Curated annotation (Swiss-Prot):
Designated name of the protein: Acireductone dioxygenase
Residues of the site described as Important to generate the dianion: 107
Major enzyme class: oxidoreductase
Annotated site location: May play a role in metal incorporation in vivo: 98
């Protein structure tokens, strides 16, 4: 279950109902998908082949199709980041630059953890700490950045309206 940390006051929201309510009020789509469907050989696997990525997409194809129909998404892929990723530190520096997109930024966490820091409606930032099974959609034009948690590894399904709209605007 995702957790929220509000930057300015350093308070946390950990209750599932309160997390969902907070994100809904901020215009952030949050869903919990059934991660137990993931085959054991793909659980915590950060060295994915193209076949592994296709299998992950197949396992969650119903959920991807459902959210895509509801939200107008048209493309998806799988990304894996870990300490074995070439230039991981350089990638994280780029990810941590505050930016926005002209489309939603959608991630479903398959393995590992990630944090989206999002500028709230009141102008203050909050972290959404994600774990396997969490799906988040950062709304278009919302200022945000992404980073990894202490384990420095994540496998995520990325879902797009268009890949062109996903280009960061700093």
């Amino acid at each position: 279950m995702a957790q929220i940390r509000i930057h300015e006051v350093n308070t946390r929201i950990e209750n599932e109902v309160e997390v969902s309510k907070f994100l809904q009020e901020e215009g952030v789509l949050y869903e919990k998908w059934n991660i137990s469907k993931l085959p054991p050989h793909l659980n915590e696997n950060y060295s994915l082949t193209d076949e592994n990525k296709a299998e992950i997409l197949a396992v969650f194809s119903k959920e991807i199709a459902d959210v895509s129909v509801r939200r107008g998404y048209k493309a998806h892929d799988v990304i894996s980041l870990s300490n074995s990723t070439p230039n991981l530190d350089e990638l994280l520096i780029n990810f941590q630059k505050e930016h926005h997109h002209t489309d939603d930024e959608v991630r479903f966490i398959v393995s590992g953890h990630g944090i989206f820091a999002i500028e709230g409606k009141d102008g203050t930032f909050f972290d959404v700490e994600l774990e396997p099974g969490d799906l988040i959609s950062v709304p278009e034009n919302a200022r945000h950045y992404f980073t990894l948690q202490d384990d420095r590894q994540v496998v995520a399904i990325r879902i797009f309206v268009t890949t062109e709209g996903w280009v960061p605007i700093y």
